């Protein structure tokens, strides 16, 4: 939205322009050596991001798919945990024009024996696809328990809520952001990330320039 560097961050800080330019040059050389000129901008950016995360020696990397998941370039990653957020009609020209077809692509990030966290409240046809994939790959399917959520306060700028007895604060408002946060909380539980780090991470999470 503001600059291309915002799409690659470590600890909330954008990749610097010099670092981006350096890695862009390295990826360009690798691309030229393949002799293939059909790589998309997102595929190039994904390669730059993965190389940057490797050089920065990150402990945990959050990798977001570009379109769908099944055929997405991010699917080269072997995840510690997979997260499927809200499935709705998006990129229908590529993913299909039914929720079941779109869900099939989204479920493409599910890997054998890797825990999969699913955004709560999905449509039944979406859940059928995801459930089947999780059973096929023998992976734990985790859906945040909305009955364990207690709303403490919500206004246009802040949300305070508790989940499973632990308090959290968001600066992104809306019920959907709470559900997104629950997915993040469950992912952090799988990764054994301590509560204080989860609380701070959620409190500092923001999407600049997404609302005016």
Predicted region positions:
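ATP-dependent carboxylate-amine ligase catalytic core
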Residues: 1-77, 93-95
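Acidic, Mg2+-coordinating active-site environments of NTP-dependent enzymes
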Residues: 34, 56-64, 79-200
């Amino acid at each position: 939205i503001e600059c291309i560097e915002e799409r690659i961050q470590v600890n909330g800080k954008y990749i610097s322009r010099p670092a981006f330019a350096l890695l862009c040059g390295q990826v360009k050389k690798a691309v030229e050596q393949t002799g293939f000129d059909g790589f998309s901008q997102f595929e190039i950016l994904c390669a730059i991001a993965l190389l940057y995360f490797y050089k920065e020696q990150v402990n945990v990397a959050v990798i977001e798919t570009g379109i769908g998941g099944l055929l997405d370039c991010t699917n080269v990653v072997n995840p510690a945990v997979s997260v499927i957020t809200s499935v709705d009609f998006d990129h229908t020209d590529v993913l299909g024009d039914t929720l079941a077809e779109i869900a099939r692509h989204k479920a493409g990030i599910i890997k054998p024996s890797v825990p999969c966290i699913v955004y709560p409240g999905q449509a039944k046809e979406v859940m059928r696809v995801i459930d089947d994939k999780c059973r096929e790959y023998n992976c734990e399917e985790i859906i945040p328990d909305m009955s364990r959520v207690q709303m403490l306060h919500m206004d246009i700028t802040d949300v305070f809520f508790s989940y499973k007895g632990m308090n959290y604060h968001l600066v992104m408002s809306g019920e959907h952001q709470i559900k997104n946060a629950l997915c993040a909380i469950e992912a952090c539980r799988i990764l054994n990330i301590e509560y204080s780090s989860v609380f701070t991470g959620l409190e500092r999470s923001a999407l600049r320039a997404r609302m005016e």
